[in-house]
Amino acid sequence: MGSFVLHGNIIDSESPERLRVAADSYLVCEEGRCTGVFSALPERFSGLPLTDFGDRLILPGMTDLHLHAPQFAFRGLGMDLELLDWLNAHTFPEEAKYADLSYAALAYGQFVDCLRRSATTRAVVFGTVHPAATTLLMELLEASGLVSYVGKVNMDRDCPEALREADAAASLAATEQWLASARFAHTKPILTPRFVPSCSDALMQGLGELAARRGLPVQSHLSENLGEIALVQSLCPQTDFYAEAYDRCGLLSQPCIMAHCVHCPPEEQDLLQARGVFIAHSPLSNSNLSSGIAPVSAYLARGLRVGLGSDLAAGETENLFRVMAEAIRVSKLRWRLADDSASPLTVAQAFYLATRGGGAFFGNVGCFEPGFAMDAVVLDDSTLLHPQELTPLERLERCIYLADERHIAAKYVAGTRLF
């Protein structure tokens, strides 16, 4: 963690509806945290090292609330299927390969290198059922300089034998084994029941007890696909809606991320709000697997906590600029074709989701207010040619639709420069 000053065109979110622009300004970091943004550098900071990024854009680092590291290897493939068929045809066969640590080292190394080059500074990641491979993934992420949560997946039913843990007791024992090795400074464990169809009642109950006993966060999937929801209703007839199956086991009582939430009825939304659950909106995967379009603007309007997920590999890219653009795009389709009661997402709202919205899962993360972690990406958009001068906000909007890792000139996580 360092202390320094950056100069450039600084943009962050004040709220979901309001962006802050400080053109030709100074961002001060002390001991890894933001001190403030200033139009002129105060004398008291004149002794700090200054990096002048000139006309470049300085943005908060982005948080990916939901992605599957073992699926990185087959991103862009198998998009002609819906969720349950896609899992059986592509996901489960690939994840079974991670029993082989040499394969895991190669594949996870490629994944981490790609994530490090992206605009993502923090991520919440699914591994596989394999404790050793999941610990290896955590080691690689720790060395990368990123901040993350990583989960060893739990599955003891309704999945291929190569991935199915023997029973709830065996799955919980493997999880305890993994937790004993998952001791890193910036890469923390998160309990990860894959979803209700692949976890027995006993396993779900045991994970809820483990979460409460150890104070561990939880991540899973919720109401992604209509076929999945129907399956959960058949498996859990005593529940009124999907999220209740998690809540009965205490899995919503700890800090929790539920990915997708495409088809949540009002009573399910009420429960998520009451428990403070984070929704990981994953528009790329919801489009690719024909799952639907989550009513994200309505979620924001009622005060639900929402961030963005790339959802590799059902989402084809880790590039959160592309995820922001897709979130805006599909919200327009939902508004036009399905529900005109909630307006489409704006650029300001999408940017908030990628930065401050998801960053809140990690605490004071995702903007440049005093006391927030100094996570930043510096964009050089000079190759995105335009015949006239654009404002910083216009440049940001273009970057949401056009930028990728080639436009990232520098990246900081908790006050440390990665490149």
Residue ranges and their predicted role:
Residues M1-F45, R56-L57:
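N-terminal metal-binding scaffold of metallo-dependent hydrolase/deaminase domains
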Residues N9, L27, G32, D55, ...:
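Divalent metal-coordination and catalytic microenvironments
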Residues S15, A373-F419:
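C-terminal cap of metal-dependent C-N hydrolases
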Residues A73-L106, K152-A168, N225-S253, F278, ...:
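Active-site gating loops and adjacent loop-to-helix segments of metal-dependent hydrolytic enzymes
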Residues R75-L146, S171-F184:
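Alpha-helical scaffold segments that flank or form the walls of functional sites
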Residues A132-C261:
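Metal-coordinating catalytic core of metallo-dependent amide/deamination hydrolases
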Residues R248-P255, S297-L385:
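His/Asp/Glu-enriched, well-ordered alpha-helical/loop segment
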